[in-house]
């Protein structure tokens, strides 16, 4: 199968009953009627005066034992639940993009997520499914996916040696960060126990276009590249520099871009 088409199929591998496939989207297996759910979940309006770390979480924060904390608007929750970037979620009322909520959710004792021994920056596949069910049950989310051809980046091997090393701690939470500064982006990047798939996802957040991993590099790695220009304010230039120094390459291309369209969403039932 064409690698671009394969990438499109991967986006729709985990769909909850609240979202269906649009006519333009390749077919995928239907969602299981026994999708996992949180054992308990509380949803509250954000309290800006609460100094608790978890109450002021921005986006997803995973804790030991699979506990999920989320802080932000409903639209951001949709992004987290479906593993999408902000530019891939459209539609919905204005409040869904501006009104902040705090969510504290716990999986059941027999959930695989209960065995998570560390704090995680990204949800597991099971946690995403549970967040999708939460959106359906508490926010009344109805949505569909559309796929169109558009500009994408292809991440491939470059001409320089790879700057990846074996992970110092293979049990650590995967991270890949290109550092941002108030004056811009300086070209420093650090990865810990991360994969090239995850690196591609992170790069897509900075470039605001999908980055498709075609490096052929498997496994988990650490990497570190030092800053080169602390005054740089051009994100694209800095990202290209980081990628090149890692022994990789970015090229513009055309490929499938999947978008989740919010058809309906309600204010949630609060606790």
Language model regions located:
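Beta-strand-rich assembly/attachment modules of structural machines
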Residues: 2-271
């Amino acid at each position: 199968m064409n690698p671009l088409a394969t990438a499109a199929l991967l986006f729709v591998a985990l769909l909850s009953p609240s979202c269906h496939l649009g006519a333009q989207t390749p077919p995928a297996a239907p969602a299981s009627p026994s999708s996992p759910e949180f054992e308990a979940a509380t949803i509250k309006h954000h309290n800006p005066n609460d100094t608790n770390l978890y109450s002021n979480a921005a986006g997803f924060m995973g804790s030991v034992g699979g506990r999920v904390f989320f802080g932000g608007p409903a639209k951001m929750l949709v992004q987290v639940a479906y593993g999408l970037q902000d530019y891939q979620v459209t539609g919905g009322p204005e409040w869904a993009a501006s009104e902040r909520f705090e969510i504290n959710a716990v999986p059941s004792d027999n959930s695989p997520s209960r065995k998570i021994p560390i704090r995680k920056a990204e949800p597991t596949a099971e946690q995403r499914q549970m967040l999708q069910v939460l959106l359906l049950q508490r926010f009344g989310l109805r949505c569909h996916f559309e796929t169109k051809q558009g500009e994408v980046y292809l991440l491939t091997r470059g001409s320089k040696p790879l700057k990846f090393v074996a992970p110092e701690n293979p049990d650590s939470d995967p991270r890949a960060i290109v550092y941002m500064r108030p004056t811009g982006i300086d070209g420093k990047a650090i990865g810990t126990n991360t994969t090239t798939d995850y690196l591609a996802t992170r790069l897509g957040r900075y470039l605001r276009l999908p980055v498709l991993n075609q490096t052929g590099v498997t496994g988990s790695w650490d990497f570190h590249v030092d800053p080169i220009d602390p005054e740089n304010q051009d994100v694209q230039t800095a990202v290209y520099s980081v990628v090149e120094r890692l022994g990789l390459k970015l090229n513009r291309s055309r490929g499938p871009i999947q978008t989740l369209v919010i058809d309906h969403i309600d204010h949630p039932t609060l606790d």
